[in-house]
Structures are given as C-alpha cells and as structure tokens.
Regions:
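A short acidic, glycine-rich active-site loop
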Residues: 58-75
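Gly/Ser-rich helix-loop-strand patches that form or flank binding pockets
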Residues: 16, 112-157
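Small/aliphatic-rich secondary-structure junction motif
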Residues: 1-61, 145, 156-157
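Structured loop/turn residues at secondary-structure junctions
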Residues: 11, 107-110, 130-131
Length: 157
C-alpha cells in the first residue's frame, strides 16, 4: 500500500504542540502530505442564542466575544503548526500531491461529524489517544467510521 495523504484531526484538550509534532513526524516518516484539521463550534450551532439572551445588544456582544475567542484559538494553532513545520523542515502546501508537505485546515462544525466526513478522502488516518483514555466522538469517528487504516499516537512523545 502506497500512502499519499494522511489525515489528522486535532481533538480537544491539552498537549496541542506535542500532538501536532507527533503527527508531522509520522508524516515525515512516510514522506506524504498531511492535512491537519482543527475544528471549532460556531456558538450559533449549539445555542439558540435568541432564547438564551434576550435583547440584541447582549446577543451581539456574546457573538463578538465568541468570535474573538475562536480567532485567538486559530492563531495559536497556526503559530504552533508553523513552528513545528519549520522545526521538521516540512513544506506548507495546500496541494495534496506534494510529498513531505502539510496543510492546516480550520473547520467550523461538530468535530466528530467533520472527522467522519473528511477522513474518507485520505489513505491513512492519524489520531491521538483521548485525554482520559475514554473513547471520544472524534476518536470513534476517526478509527471506526472512516473506513481507513489508522495509526494512534500518544498525546505526549
């Protein structure tokens, strides 16, 4: 089996830099392209904001605050990704056909549903061990619902 494309969904929790580093190391070993997917929930998806907050000003402040937090989280993930790619000498490229390259994709939605959907477009799924050892929705979607071979890496190397 020749691998061309690896998919790594970033789950929740700590050890973000360690997990990205581990995923990029596996990618470098195989000489493939890796798509790293970071997911965030849109506050409008999980709350009926109009029912939770009465009044337009409070709702707008809530959505602005949530949007600011989402942007800050994306910036942190991007900075870690950039640093780890530079450290390992991997090119950042959105083209899936470039070997020894990586791409970071930020998605908005329910993580387990996005993982199940996008994991079907790769040759290998890479997933990190859930933080508590209990199976999470992201882990289950990556391992059992993708239909692809899977490598599980530790959260800390």
């Amino acid at each position: 089996m020749q691998l061309k494309k690896i998919f790594f969904p970033i789950g929740g929790g700590e050890e973000l830099a360690e997990r990205i580093h581990g995923a990029l190391l596996v990618n470098k070993f195989f000489g493939t392209h890796i798509n790293i997917m970071a997911c965030q929930l849109d506050p409008k998806m999980i709350y009926n904001v109009r029912m939770t907050l009465k009044g337009g000003v409070l709702m707008e402040e809530f959505l602005k605050s949530a949007g600011d937090e989402m942007r800050a989280e994306r910036e942190v993930i991007k900075a870690i990704f950039d640093a780890e790619c530079a450290k390992l000498g991997l090119d950042q490229n959105d083209d899936d056909h470039v070997p020894n390259s990586a791409a970071l994709r930020h998605m908005v939605g329910i993580r387990s549903e996005l993982v199940e959907k996008y994991s079907k477009y790769c040759d290998l799924v890479l997933v990190s061990v859930p933080p508590t050892g209990s199976i999470t929705g992201t882990f289950e979607a990556a391992v059992t619902k993708s239909g692809k071979p899977c490598i599980v890496i530790p959260r800390k190397l």
